């Protein structure tokens, strides 16, 4: 995959597992929720494996795994999780190595940068500010910015629209099957980082167009897209 060239104007980047290792924050919040419900904590890897499809899905799977569903109301549990996550958000996790250098290089080369995440805006905004990553990003499309979330392609199209870039000139950078599915549905290339929350089999098994060990390696894979001449 080292010889892959991905033409693009906009680089759309996932948050959890791609820019920031949020798993410690999320797992701690989930286990605090379970403690409130009188249930033992789940293993770190179990909860981390539920990351990527939004908070309601994560909470539902945590409740099922802890054998608390359906007697615990999922809506109440989501509110409980959010309360704890507001406290842990950005406190235990960290920016992955190479992320800031990679984003800075992409900006210098003129690429338009957006973060497209399934994390709610109320959590994504403070996390990006706390980590200092918001300075590199022009646009944030969060899990509640529009009606759809990844793997639906609409968040990717919405990000490109906000950047005033043709959606066909985007490339998605992520870490999971959710990102691959969203990019395929949007008809754009997808590059996965080798770290993150890909799950069993790792990112190599997910059929991405490219893999990188770090965002520092991403600029070498990209080539500026050329607009077709006007008719």
UniProtKB/Swiss-Prot annotation:
Catalytic reaction list: 2-phosphoglycolate + H2O = glycolate + phosphate
Keywords for this protein: Calvin cycle, Carbohydrate metabolism, Hydrolase, Magnesium, Metal-binding, Plasmid
Protein's UniProt keywords contain Cytoplasm: no
Chain positions recorded as Mg(2+) binding sites: 14, 16, 175
Cofactor(s) in the UniProt record: Mg(2+)
The keyword Metal-binding belongs to this UniProt entry's keyword annotation: yes
Protein's UniProt name: Phosphoglycolate phosphatase, plasmid
Species: Cupriavidus necator (strain ATCC 17699 / DSM 428 / KCTC 22496 / NCIMB 10442 / H16 / Stanier 337)
Name of the gene encoding the protein in the UniProt record: cbbZP
């Amino acid at each position: 995959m080292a010889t892959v060239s991905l033409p693009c104007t906009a680089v759309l980047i996932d948050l959890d597992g791609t820019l920031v290792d949020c798993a410690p924050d999320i797992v701690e919040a989930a286990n605090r929720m379970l403690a409130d419900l009188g249930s033992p904590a789940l293993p770190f890897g179990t909860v981390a494996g539920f990351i990527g499809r939004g908070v309601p899905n994560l909470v539902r799977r945590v409740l099922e795994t802890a054998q608390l569903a359906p007697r615990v109301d999922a809506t109440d549990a989501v509110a409980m999780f959010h309360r704890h996550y507001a406290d842990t958000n950005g406190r235990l996790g960290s920016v992955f190595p190479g992320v800031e250098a990679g984003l800075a290089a992409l900006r210098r080369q003129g690429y338009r940068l957006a973060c497209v995440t399934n994390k709610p805006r109320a959590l994504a905004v403070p996390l990006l500010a706390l980590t200092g990553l918001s300075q590199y990003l022009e646009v944030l499309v969060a899990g509640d910015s529009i009606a759809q979330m990844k793997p639906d392609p609409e968040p990717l199209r919405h990000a490109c629209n906000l950047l005033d870039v043709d959606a066909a000139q985007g490339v998605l950078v992520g870490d999971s099957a959710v990102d691959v599915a969203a990019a395929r549905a949007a008809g754009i290339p997808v590059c996965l980082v080798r770290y993150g929350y890909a799950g069993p089999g790792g990112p190599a098994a997910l059929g991405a167009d490219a893999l990188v060990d770090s965002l520092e390696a991403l600029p070498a894979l990209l080539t500026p897209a050329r607009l077709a001449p006007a008719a």
